[in-house]
A protein has these predicted regions:
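Long, positively charged, glycine-interspersed low-complexity recognition regions
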Residues: 1-4, 12, 241-317
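Hydrophobic transmembrane alpha-helices
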Residues: 1-61, 275-283
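Short helix-perturbing small/polar motifs within transmembrane alpha-helices
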Residues: 9-11, 15, 79-125
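Alpha-helical membrane segments and adjacent membrane-interface helices in multi-pass membrane proteins
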Residues: 32-91, 301, 305
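Central hydrophobic cores of alpha-helical transmembrane segments
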Residues: 57-65, 103-110, 278-288, 301-303
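Membrane-interface interhelical loops and short interface/amphipathic helices
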Residues: 120-172
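Hydrophobic, aromatic-enriched interface-forming segments
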Residues: 151-209
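Small-residue-rich helix-loop
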Residues: 202-258, 262-263
């Protein structure tokens, strides 16, 4: 009875924290983006400490109150996207699954949640969130063109600039499925690390991830990467409207992300084994987000590491 009361009290506190986090994500612009990303944390902690039943209760209470305070739509999307991830991660942590297995289940849960969000938007609300987003992008381009005209830019320069943005938005729309696949494990990883730190402070213990510099991406990733590269090159020249072009671009996106990760690991391995300053690797990682050419170089670095095994950590038959 005492244990049940304790679980009920803790679930109530965690539900209140989830509600406060939802308010921050809604009304605090910069901090809100990060808080929104880790919104599953209270659900994860409750599930890990008290089980799936109490984490579901926490999610339901938080969702109902958020619907009353903010709006049913916001509550609906929070529960659909982040709630499911929180339930899965919480149950996996309660069972003390190995970190890599936990990440696999968390990533699958994140993908299901993102897809579920889009499907439910169609069915329940009758809206297409992706088309809505890109429609707003198109409208912003009209305003941007007017702004350029008011500031004396020539029509040729305006057209070149707007066409560049249109091409960027077109590619964003094509790679949206691949972006979901990439975003899901990142979301699961961030929430797992945060939950692990909190639960460790509360006296729990979890198996550690392998050393970062010893992580490796499966070698078979090279095959879909090179095949998608050939397919993208071919369909780019022949039929960019083909679904095969879109599929190839998404496969290339996911594989490129995996190879970039492999390249980053190799950079940190080199810095650590050669006793170089760690900020070298930090700057190299930062350059990925600033210089497109550098990110492509890191893709090739990751690919070469898979082929030649510079760290000598793979089993060779």
């Amino acid at each position: 009875m005492i244990r049940k009361t304790s679980a009920m009290v803790e679930a109530g506190i965690l539900a209140a924290i989830a509600i406060v986090m939802a308010l921050i994500s809604m009304y605090v612009p910069v901090l809100g983006a990060f808080v929104n990303f880790v919104w599953p944390l209270p659900i994860v902690i409750c599930g890990s400490r008290h089980g799936l039943k109490w984490s579901i209760m926490t999610l339901l209470v938080a969702t109902i109150i958020i619907a009353m305070i903010m709006s049913p739509v916001n509550a609906f999307f929070l529960a659909a996207i982040f709630g499911l991830l929180g339930l899965i991660l919480g149950e996996c942590m309660r069972r003390h699954l190995p970190p890599m297995k936990l990440m696999l289940f968390g990533a699958i849960g994140g993908i299901i949640a993102l897809v579920l969000n889009i499907v439910l938007s169609f069915v329940v609300l009758g809206i297409d969130p992706i088309n809505m987003m890109f429609t707003s992008f198109d409208e912003s381009l009209v305003q941007l063109a007017e702004y350029y005209r008011e500031h004396g830019m020539s029509e040729a320069d305006i057209k070149a600039s707007i066409d560049g943005y249109k091409e960027m938005f077109r590619m964003m729309k094509i790679i949206m499925p691949g972006a979901f696949l990439v975003c899901a494990p990142i979301m699961a990883f961030v929430n797992y690390i945060c939950a692990k730190k909190i639960l460790t402070k509360l006296g729990d213990s979890f198996e550690s991830f392998p050393s970062f510099i010893m992580l490796k991406v499966p070698q078979w990733v090279l095959w879909p990467y090179f095949l998608s590269l050939l397919a993208v090159t071919y369909f780019y020249q022949t039929d960019q409207s083909s679904w095969m072009y879109a599929a190839a671009v998404n496969v290339q996106t996911v594989c490129s992300f995996s190879l970039v990760f492999q390249g980053i690991v190799l950079i940190y391995w080199y810095v650590e084994t050669k006793k170089k300053p760690r900020w070298w690797a930090n700057i190299g990682t930062a350059l990925l987000f600033m210089i497109p050419l550098f990110s492509q170089i890191i893709v090739y670095v990751g690919a070469f590491d898979m082929v030649f095994d510079f760290r000598k950590i793979r089993n060779h038959r």
